């Protein structure tokens, strides 16, 4: 996707994947700065380290404590989080973004922190469910401190019998369920999340899984319903990163075609929304 975009604007396609152990990351970041890299993307579990290691962080990165993008220039290493742009694009493109909604958020990792930042600006209430409740509570506490936040935040646990009535109510009232965990495995499909009160969900609730691929989404197995995957989010967070690196308008259709080909699906199945690019991480001509 990124190489196709670089080629489309006349630059050499040199976007490469690097697989690293956690212990190798500090040396790699120093090398990237010294060897003239223009930018980097980070996936789990390196998003927190990307925030901590950068010389300059955007406000969104400071709020969430995670970054998925670095821009490297004469200004030094700058950290951004374009996941928020991607999420907003995905929810808007599918007509799922509406003020005053109640949301169930699965997971409390790096992706969930950016998702929470967006949800806090328009949702009425957000229930965060995670196997480590302390991580879920940290997300809630961070969002409640933000001036843009208008949501009520809640953490409930299936393991606590006293939480079950509140869980049932939250699921029954949820307009959206967003799975940020990013794991499509058989073990997860039969794990503790399978015992959540999925039958209580309203039939009108929209379901989103930030992961993508050919394996079934756990959400679809738990609910027996259709689930939107994260391809649209991936496209738009990638386009925002592209513009940060190049200071050029991202060739969104080229990127979509390349992504669709990689995923083996029609390009039309991945909606495009140019207005989402730079919505939260503003830059260049979009300021």
Predicted features by range, described:
Residues 1-96, 214, 222:
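Phosphate/diphosphate ligand-binding glycine-rich loop within oxidoreductases
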Residues 79-81, 91, 95-120, 129-135:
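Glycine-rich adenosine-cofactor-binding loop
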Residues 121-125, 225-226:
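Conserved S-adenosyl-L-methionine
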Residues 123-149:
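NAD(P)-binding Rossmann-fold cofactor-contacting core
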Residues 132, 157-192:
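Rossmann-like NAD(P)-binding element
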Residues 252-287:
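A short, charged, Gly/Pro-tolerant segment at domain boundaries
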């Amino acid at each position: 996707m990124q190489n196709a975009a670089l080629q489309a604007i006349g630059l050499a396609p040199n976007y490469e994947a690097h697989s690293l152990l956690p212990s190798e990351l500090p040396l790699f970041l120093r090398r990237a700065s010294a060897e003239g890299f223009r930018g980097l993307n980070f996936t789990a579990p390196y998003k927190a380290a990307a925030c901590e290691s950068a010389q300059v962080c955007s406000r969104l990165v400071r709020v969430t404590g995670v970054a998925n993008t670095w821009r490297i220039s004469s200004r030094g290493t700058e950290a951004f989080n374009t996941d928020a742009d991607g999420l907003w694009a995905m929810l808007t493109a599918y007509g799922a973004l509406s003020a005053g909604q109640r949301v169930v958020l699965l997971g409390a990792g790096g992706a969930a922190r950016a998702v929470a930042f967006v949800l806090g600006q328009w949702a009425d209430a957000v229930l965060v469910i995670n196997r480590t409740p302390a991580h879920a509570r940290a997300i809630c506490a961070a969002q409640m401190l933000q001036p843009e936040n208008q949501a009520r935040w809640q953490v409930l646990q299936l393991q606590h019998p006293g939480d079950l009535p509140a869980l049932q109510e939250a699921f029954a009232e949820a307009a959206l369920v967003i799975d940020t965990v990013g794991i499509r495995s058989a073990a997860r499909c039969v794990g503790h999340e399978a015992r959540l009160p999925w039958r209580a969900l309203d039939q009108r609730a929209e379901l989103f899984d930030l992961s993508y691929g050919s394996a079934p989404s756990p959400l679809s197995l738990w609910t027996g319903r259709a689930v939107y995957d994260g391809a649209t989010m991936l496209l738009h967070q990638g386009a925002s990163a592209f513009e940060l690196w190049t200071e050029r308008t991202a060739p969104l259709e080229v990127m979509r075609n390349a992504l669709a080909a990689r995923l083996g699906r029609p390009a039309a199945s991945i909606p495009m929304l140019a207005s989402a690019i730079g919505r939260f991480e503003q830059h260049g001509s979009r300021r």
